Every structure is written in C-alpha cells, then in structure tokens.
A protein has these predicted regions:
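Polytopic alpha-helical membrane-helix bundles and their juxtamembrane interface segments
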Residues: 1-200
C-alpha cells in the first residue's frame, strides 16, 4: 500500500506542478486536491485507532481544506488557509501530546529556529505579522511534541511539514516563484503521507 500511495501522490503532484507552470488552473486544482485526498485515503485504509489516530486524521482532513483555500492567491483565501492549517497543527499537537515525552532542550532548539525564521520574515510581513506569529507558535509546539513521540514516521512527518512551510513563507513573502513549490510541495506531501501511516 505504501508504494502505491507514494506513486499516486507523486503522479498527482506532478500533474499539479506541470499545470501550475503552464497556468492551467483547473488541472492545477485537480492535481493538488487529488494528492491531498490521497493522504486522507491512506489514513482511512490503514484503519484509524485511538486518540492519536483520530487526532492525526482530523489534522489531515483540515489540511485538505487548507490546500483548497491556498489554491487562490487572494489575501483573504491565504488567511483562511493559514487559519485552517493552524487548526490542523492544533489537532496534530493534541494528538501527539497524549503520547509524547517532550524535551526542554528540543523545545529551546525548535523555538530558536522559529525565532530565526521570524526575524528573516519580519520586515516583509506587514499587516500579516500577527497571524504569522500565531501560526509559527502553533507549528513550533506541534513539532516539539512530535519530536517527543517514539514513532519515526511522526518525527519525520512533523519535521518535513515544518520545512515545507518555510518554502510557503518564502513563496508568499520573500521571493515568489514555482521553484518554491517544486521543492516545498514534495516535502509537504511526504510529511502528510508519513503522518497518515501513523494513524494506527
């Protein structure tokens, strides 16, 4: 199942990126939402178990909604997508909190990275400073808790998700361009597939 899921997501993501490069909006949306639906399907096929599994599934479903909203370049859609992904990270964090053994040292390290990212973004954020800071706080907490879970797929998935969001931020606030999505989206879908595999 893993190989099939990876192949399906890779194919749909390739369609999305190809369409994005050519301005084919309908195909771009279909490829991205198809790839996003696939990671939810993987979780359901695995069989969702316990508070951890249901929390992860909630995060995955919210992520699909966020992906749909972020297909638009409008500021309102970006804010709505940011809010939806914030809720997804809350769901992940709550799921991980029940099984994590968090480390204060890891908390300091992750917080230091996030502060460096915010310093990099700060001059470019303008009116988006408050929502971006709030989002960064939540994803930092999510990553910290994930790194305290004794499940390699959860640790790797959370770290890749965090890394992919750096590319989203670069695309939105620093240097927009397809290159951000060519690098960032594979990281994002790898992250979500890893988390989907952790539902049981």
């Amino acid at each position: 199942m893993r190989a099939t899921a990876i192949a399906l997501v890779a194919a749909l993501l390739s369609v999305h990126l190809w369409a994005d490069a050519r301005g084919a909006r309908a195909l771009r949306a279909a490829g991205k939402l198809g790839a996003s639906a696939a990671f939810v399907a993987v979780a359901l096929a695995r069989g969702v178990e316990g508070a951890l599994g249901h929390g992860i599934l909630t995060g995955l479903v919210l992520s699909v909604v966020g992906d749909a909203l972020l297909l638009s370049s409008r500021r309102a859609a970006f804010l709505a997508g940011l809010g939806t992904f914030l809720l997804a990270h809350v769901a992940y964090a709550l799921a991980f909190a029940g099984v994590a053994r968090p480390s204060a040292v890891v908390a300091l390290a992750v917080a230091a990275i996030t502060l460096a990212v915010l310093r990099w973004l700060w001059p470019r954020l303008g009116a988006m400073r408050t929502p971006v800071v709030l989002y960064c706080a939540v994803i930092t907490a999510m990553l910290w808790l994930a790194l305290g879970v004794d499940r390699p797929e959860i640790r790797a998935g959370a770290a890749l998700f965090y890394a992919s969001d750096l590319l989203v931020a670069r695309d939105r606030f620093v240097r927009p361009g397809l290159a951000n999505r060519v690098v960032g989206l594979p990281l994002y879908y790898a992250a979500q597939l890893l988390l989907a595999l952790a539902v049981r």
